[in-house]
Amino acid sequence: MPAVSKGDGMRGLAVFISDIRNCKSKEAEIKRINKELANIRSKFKGDKALDGYSKKKYVCKLLFIFLLGHDIDFGHMEAVNLLSSNRYTEKQIGYLFISVLVNSNSELIRLINNAIKNDLASRNPTFMGLALHCIASVGSREMAEAFAGEIPKVLVAGDTMDSVKQSAALCLLRLYRTSPDLVPMGDWTSRVVHLLNDQHLGVVTAATSLITTLAQKNPEEFKTSVSLAVSRLSRIVTSASTDLQDYTYYFVPAPWLSVKLLRLLQCYPPPDPAVRGRLTECLETILNKAQEPPKSKKVQHSNAKNAVLFEAISLIIHHDSEPNLLVRACNQLGQFLQHRETNLRYLALESMCTLASSEFSHEAVKTHIETVINALKTERDVSVRQRAVDLLYAMCDRSNAPQIVAEMLSYLETADYSIREEIVLKVAILAEKYAVDYTWYVDTILNLIRIAGDYVSEEVWYRVIQIVINRDDVQGYAAKTVFEALQAPACHENLVKVGGYILGEFGNLIAGDPRSSPLIQFHLLHSKFHLCSVPTRALLLSTYIKFVNLFPEVKPTIQDVLRSDSQLRNADVELQQRAVEYLRLSTVASTDILATVLEEMPPFPERESSILAKLKKKKGPSTVTDLEDTKRDRSVDVNGGPEPAPASTSAVSTPSPSADLLGLGAAPPAPAGPPPSSGGSGLLVDVFSDSASVVAPLAPGSEDNFARFVCKNNGVLFENQLLQIGLKSEFRQNLGRMFIFYGNKTSTQFLNFTPTLICSDDLQPNLNLQTKPVDPTVEGGAQVQQVVNIECVSDFTEAPVLNIQFRYGGTFQNVSVQLPITLNKFFQPTEMASQDFFQRWKQLSNPQQEVQNIFKAKHPMDTEVTKAKIIGFGSALLEEVDPNPANFVGAGIIHTKTTQIGCLLRLEPNLQAQMYRLTLRTSKEAVSQRLCELLSAQF
């Protein structure tokens, strides 16, 4: 609503608004409005032609009445007439009315479009701005059809004023978001990119927003924006530059533009080393400025400064390729963890969750564990405590799992009810994933049920039963522990379920102790029977019949219970049926038949943890960019152990229906993939067969990404505007398992999605790869997983190629990347004393056993990063072995199916010359050569 001014005020409008405000009741307001509507209608229909001022005044009144919630069914034509006025205030009110009241189905839409086109063609910047604002405000598909071809011309025209360019860029962005198919790409795209060099802050800021959105679906059209964006960012953040210094906001130059440029650069990893180096300098400068004392105490200064810093950290995390920057970002975020500003603490915790998934920064994140635990205990804001829980979950590994699980259990007792179930799932996952001693796992889950039994879902207690059944070494301890837990006066029903199942299977393992004799076990369980729900009672009845088989001495007691009226005449059909059938079975079946029917449950088949699946579902639909679980200690081993399963093509036997008395086939089987071809050789997928379709050459940047995975196992292998490929892998001796995640970054389905692993003739005999097919349809925004089992038969020098073919929007897509399965993945670290090391070093002194490489450092020579890379390479890092403390010494064994190959390495850095000398000695020349090539490329 325009302000009332003396020069162009509408006194009648001001009086009408005052009258409405002074109304004492709803009826009085309606009466006054109806009176005014009658007056306006008579003026519009009168014989006397109204001047522009009167039309404007009456249209404003109609607009005000509409905003009060009353329908307006006239005055539209008068508003359209105002669009033809040459007076700004009249045209402004006309556009305001059109933007608010006229819909796309109006009969006047043709007249409105003509008026907008006339204003766009007028070259009057004020009128052009009004027209563009109207198009953006309406933003309908009809508007896009009418003007999507016109606005780019206005945007790139040489004589368009800066204010109009800014409006045109934002208007085009609005139309593209509502109707992307109606905005044609063309010659104008290259000219829009050059707006990144514009000297007007509004133009370059609007253009950056537009380019960022357009580039996400049209990457090829806008790839030239990378160098321009880096150059502009460099000029802004470098203090020596004067670029946009007039737009300094509280001592921070162009902060919002910097944020948008950093966000644009997340779309494209810089392919050119020079551009990448300049971007790294920019990011280092931003991190350095964050360490400087504030130039102002005002909150606006810190807000602007931190906005740029957090966006820079997001870019560093997204690229995940600069160890130094990642560690520095982590240290900077660590300072924010104790900041007095709650929002900064929240953002720091959120960003560190992502940093924890990087191989390079995981250890740096772990150094802040005490601060995060303290935040969990002392934070007042529940959302910050939630982020602290997320960060503890993300930073957890085998070294700190007991501490983190204990802290999360402690917090669970006082946690907000809204997040308890999620914490329960995370504790259950961590306890299983990092359990070295499975007695600790059993204790943790039982403690979890005790503290938060109402929030322990079926998936959690199903899972503990699966693991106990699959691991012989923990069965006796589990039976003893649940027996002791059930002796508490008040037990949660989930504990009764777990106790009933485990004692029914393994109660015999503790029956030799008089304190847990069969009869005592039965009476303990039966004392809980009448307090439980029907499903739990059904489970306990199944436990009783198992006791009949395990302990013949309690058979009469159990038969009396089954024979009682409360069971045989139970109102619940399921309980009645079980009682009748179990009683009959215990009466007529011989001992051998009873033992066969009620035999111990076989191990559960291997599959993804249903708890992990439930947590993913609870966190919402998985986004492609959120590889939250891509963490250092790989995936959960579904049979409860840390060892990867050996590659095998044999089917896993599943329990028969008769044996699954308690219905504990907990997680539904994964959806079956396409059936194997009839000509197949028995493998689920013939990964070595020649595909009829043409395999694409390696994608740009594939070799760089491949090199990044030599010293790490998790991360994003490939990413373009359509597809993201993430990896999680684990290796033990000559076996490995790799989880490949294919993420659809678009809103459109991928059809005929077919990933294929290709091995060369030289590689095929030395490396066995076996996998299963994936669903040929990948929904928009969804992610599918593929598991590859790996066996190293003999040493090798090449890497397999992953080829992905699919259809997107009717277009065939073909992508090939190298899969980072390298010889060092089968490296097992070996600790050696100094004397043993040099003795072995001398034994490997033949010329063919040693390979040496002297090379220039490609990255900053940082001691901690070097140590992390050597350890990530697979070697043990031997301390105090080399007489020169600046040198690095390592040892390990390459495991293959046919042999084991010992390996010793020595890395000598020369800081002054910025050079390295790497020496490797193994018993096999080809192995020495390959390991030297792989490790040299990391420095």
Curated annotation (Swiss-Prot):
UniProt note on tissues of expression: Expressed in the brain (at protein level).
Disordered: annotated segments: 612-681
Residues the record lists as binding a 1,2-diacyl-sn-glycero-3-phospho-(1D-myo-inositol-3,4,5-trisphosphate): R11, G12, K43, Y53, K57, Y58, V59, C60, K61
InterPro entries xref list: Adaptor_Complx_Large_Subunit, AP2_complex_asu, ARM-like, ARM-type_fold, Clathrin/coatomer_adapt-like_N, Clathrin_a-adaptin_app_sub_C, Clathrin_a/b/g-adaptin_app_Ig, Clathrin_app_Ig-like_sf
Gene3D superfamilies referenced in this protein's UniProt entry, alphabetically: 2.60.40.1230, Leucine-rich Repeat Variant, TATA-Binding Protein
GO biological process: clathrin-dependent endocytosis; intracellular protein transport; postsynaptic neurotransmitter receptor internalization; synaptic vesicle endocytosis; vesicle-mediated transport
The keyword Aminoacyl-tRNA synthetase is assigned to this record: no
Topology of the protein relative to the lipid bilayer: Peripheral membrane protein
Biased composition (Pro residues): 668-677
A Pfam family this chain is assigned to: Adaptin_N
Entry's localization field: Cell membrane; Membrane, Coated pit
GO molecular function: clathrin adaptor activity; disordered domain specific binding; lipid binding; protein kinase binding
NADP among keywords: no
Function summary: Component of the adaptor protein complex 2 (AP-2). Adaptor protein complexes function in protein transport via transport vesicles in different membrane traffic pathways. Adaptor protein complexes are vesicle coat components and appear to be involved in cargo selection and vesicle formation. AP-2 is involved in clathrin-dependent endocytosis in which cargo proteins are incorporated into vesicles surrounded by clathrin (clathrin-coated vesicles, CCVs) which are destined for fusion with the early endosome.
Protein name from the UniProt record: AP-2 complex subunit alpha-2
Organism whose genome encodes this protein: Homo sapiens (Human)
Name of the gene encoding the protein in the UniProt record: AP2A2
